[in-house]
C-alpha cells in the first residue's frame, strides 16, 4: 500500500531540487485567495441522510483498459470495472469517458490522495520520517469530509490491511470524524487473524472485503447513517499473488490488477443486494497513479495516465449539469464537495476548500486559472500574508510553524527535526 511504504519513498525521491527550493523559499498566496472555509459554508443534508461506501483502489488506472477504450493495453485488464463505469458517473478531462483527474503537487501517494479528498487541500512530503502528524494533530484546523459527516451523526469506519499508524493514516481519520480505525493491528488484536499472520503489507484484500461486509452490516444495524471507507492494497507494486488468482497474463502485476478488479466488482454486487443499498452511494477511485515503473516502460511518454473514478447510485435529488462530465480539468481536491453532492447534500456556492462540486457548472480552480499555473503556485511556500489565515485554519501556534516550514502540510511529531 503506497500510503505506508513505497509512496513515501517515491514522493521524496521525486521531489526535485528546484521544487524543494520553491517549497521553502518562493512564496504564494494562492491558497489564501482561493480557499473556501468548509465550516462556514452552508450545507443542507437531505431529510433521510444517505450512507456512503468510499473505496480507494490502490494504483487503479484507466490506462489498464484496452486501447479501443482509451487505455494502453491490447486486452482490457479491468473489464468488470469498465462494466461498472457504464452504470455510474465518471469525470473526464477529454471527450472519452475513461480519463480521470489530474495529478497536481501533493497527491501522488496514498495518504496524500486521502488527505486531498478529505480536506480539499494538497499535501507535501516532509523530510524527517514516516510519521505524518500525531493523535489529534493531523491538519488540526481543517474541517474535513469526515468532520462534516461526524457532525451530522454518521457512524464512520475506515479499514486498511496494513498498519494504519505507519505514515499517519490513523491520525487523519481519528482526528477528523471520530472514525473507528480497523487495520492490521486491529485484526490481530481482536482475533480476526492468528497472531503470526502476515501477507503483503498485513492482510490481503480477500480478507479486507470479508471483514468489510461484517463491519458494514454492523454499521447498518446501528440505525444511523454510515460511512465505510476502505483502502485496497493488492495492486500495489509488484502485485500481490492471491492463492485464488488466475494466471490469465504472463505478468504478475497484470494478473494482480485483473484479479483485484474482479473482487471489487463482486463486492459492489454484494452491496447492491443489501437492504441499505437504495440509500447508499458508492465511490470507487484509484488513489494515485501506479508506481510500478517496469509495467509502463513501453508506454508512450505522452500518454495521459489517469486514476479510475466512479460514483454509483447517487442521490435521486442530485442536481446534475448536462455538461459536467467531459472536458473537465479536476483533481482529488474536488472529490470533497462532489461526494457530498452525490449524497444529496446542497452546498452553498458548490465549493469547499480548494475543491469544486463537479456535478455543478462551477469551474474548478484548475479550470479557472489553468492547470500549470495552479500547480506551480501550490508547489510554493505559503506567503507571509497568509499567516493569519493559517493560524485561523490551524488554531495552534505549533501547526502554524509547521505550515510555515512545509507550506500547508500538517503537524509532524518533531518540528525542530522537521524544519
Give the role of each language-model region.
Residues 38-50, 54-419:
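Solvent-exposed soluble domains appended to multi-pass membrane proteins
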Residues 14, 26, 31, 273, ...:
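A general marker of short, structured functional hotspots
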Residues 1-22:
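Transmembrane and membrane-interface helices of multi-pass
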Residues 21-38:
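Short extracytoplasmic/periplasmic juxtamembrane "stem" segments immediately C-terminal to an N-terminal membrane anchor
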Amino acid at each position: 500500500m503506497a500510503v505506508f511504504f513505497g509512496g513515501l519513498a517515491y514522493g521524496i525521491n521525486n521531489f526535485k531540487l528546484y521544487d524543494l527550493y520553491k517549497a521553502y523559499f518562493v512564496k504564494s498566496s494562492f491558497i489564501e485567495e482561493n480557499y473556501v472555509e468548509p465550516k462556514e459554508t452552508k450545507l443542507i443534508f437531505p431529510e433521510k441522510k444517505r450512507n456512503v461506501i468510499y473505496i480507494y483502489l490502490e494504483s487503479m488506472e484507466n490506462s489498464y483498459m484496452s486501447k479501443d477504450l482509451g487505455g494502453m493495453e491490447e486486452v482490457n485488464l479491468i473489464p468488470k470495472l469498465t462494466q461498472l463505469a457504464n452504470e455510474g458517473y465518471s469525470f473526464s478531462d477529454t471527450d472519452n469517458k475513461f480519463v480521470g483527474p489530474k495529478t497536481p503537487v501533493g497527491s501522488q501517494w496514498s495518504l496524500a490522495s486521502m488527505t486531498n479528498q478529505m480536506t480539499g487541500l494538497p499535501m507535501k512530503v516532509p523530510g524527517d520520517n514516516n510519521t505524518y502528524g500525531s493523535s489529534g494533530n493531523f491538519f488540526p484546523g481543517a474541517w474535513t469530509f469526515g468532520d462534516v459527516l461526524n457532525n451530522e451523526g454518521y457512524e464512520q469506519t475506515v479499514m486498511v490491511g496494513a498498519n494504519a499508524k505507519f505514515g499517519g493514516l490513523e491520525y487523519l481519520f481519528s482526528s477528523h470524524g471520530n472514525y473507528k480505525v480497523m487495520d492490521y493491528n486491529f485484526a490481530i488484536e481482536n482475533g480476526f487473524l492468528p497472531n503470526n499472520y502476515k501477507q503483503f503489507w498485513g492482510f490481503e484484500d480477500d480478507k479486507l472485503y470479508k471483514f468489510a461486509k461484517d463491519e458494514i452490516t454492523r454499521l447498518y444495524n446501528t440505525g444511523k447513517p454510515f460511512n465505510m471507507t476502505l483502502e485496497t492494497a493488492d495492486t500495489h507494486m509488484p502485485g500481490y499473488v492471491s492463492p485464488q488468482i488466475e494466471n490469465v497474463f504472463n505478468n504478475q502485476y497484470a494478473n494482480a490488477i485483473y484479479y483485484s478488479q474482479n473482487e471489487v466488482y463482486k463486492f459492489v454486487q454484494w452491496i447492491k443486494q443489501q437492504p441499505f443499498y437504495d440509500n447508499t452511494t458508492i465511490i470507487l477511485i484509484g488513489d494515485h497513479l501506479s508506481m510500478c515503473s517496469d509495467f509502463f516502460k513501453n508506454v508512450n511518454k505522452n500518454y495521459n495516465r489517469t486514476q479510475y473514478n466512479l460514483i454509483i447510485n447517487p442521490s435521486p435529488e442530485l442536481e446534475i449539469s448536462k455538461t459536467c462530465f467531459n472536458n473537465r480539468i479536476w483533481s482529488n481536491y474536488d472529490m470533497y464537495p462532489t461526494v457530498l453532492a452525490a449524497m444529496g447534500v446542497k452546498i452553498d456556492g458548490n465549493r469547499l476548500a480548494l475543491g469544486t462540486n463537479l456535478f455543478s457548472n462551477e469551474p474548478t480552480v484548475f479550470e479557472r486559472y489553468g492547470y500549470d499555473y495552479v500547480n506551480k503556485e501550490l508547489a510554493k511556500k505559503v506567503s507571509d500574508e497568509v499567516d493569519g489565515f493559517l493560524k485561523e485554519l490551524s488554531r495552534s501556534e505549533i501547526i502554524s510553524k509547521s505550515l510555515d516550514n512545509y507550506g500547508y502540510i500538517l503537524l509532524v511529531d518533531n518540528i525542530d527535526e522537521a524544519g
